[in-house]
Amino acid sequence: GDGAHSLNISTAVALVVAACEVPVAKHGNRAASSKAGAADTLEALGLNLDRASAQAEASLTDLGICFLFAQKHHPALAPLAPIRKAIGRRTVFNLTGPLANPAGVTRQLIGVARPDFLPVYAEAIAALEYQAVMLVSGDEPLDELSVCGPSTCLTVGRPAERLAPEDFGLTRHAPEDLRGGDPAYNADALRRLLMGETGAYRDAVLLNAGAALVVAGHAHDVRDGIEEAAEALDRGLAKALLDCWIAY
């Protein structure tokens, strides 16, 4: 919901983190302010959205990952989908969506579309029953940790930090290197990533997966998390997980 029309970074991050044996409940929807949302891209990869959502609990138990299709879990909002699509830009639903995961998660990496929204999210998080949350916003703006420039990272109870890809040994990339397309385009890029393709997409996924592994208590710091995420990609664990998920 940041309007950057980038590749599906958080969807790829979910697969990589789950391949690191951290259970992930991915909550997403079809595109409203972009060309391809998480649901669109996963469907283009071959995931049956209705079945995946209906079997979410079993999938999370058996595979360590599930997809919670927002249209199925928040049916009262379904009639608004065409209106949001017609508006074509961020609405209040882009802001509240990350806080409405039906799985009731207690640890979460939350991407925020604009840095000035971070304090508002922090107030909301403080009122909810989370164990650990990291709020991140790229300067582009981008609702992820950015590999195209600096990002702001806010953990409740701690001062905000400024982070850059170079801080973690990653290359800085141009925003157009992460530009996405329609669901088929984004799905193809994600599959190539899982098959070992390097570049901006991989670096963006590694950085955000590294942060997610810290939030999960699975990595000591982001650098350690990046190393673990890279291993999950290089050993084909994330690709194998996607294949199992599609066949489940």
Regions found by a protein language model. Name each.
Residues 1-32:
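Active-site cofactor/substrate anionic-group-binding motifs, chiefly glycine-
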Residues 6, 43-50, 58-248:
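Glycine-rich anion-binding loops and their surrounding alpha/beta cores
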Residues 17-20, 34-37, 99-102, 168-170:
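A short alpha-helix capping/helix-coil boundary motif
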Residues 28, 51-53:
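Short beta->alpha connector loops at strand-helix junctions that form conserved
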Residues 30-48:
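Active-site-proximal loop->helix
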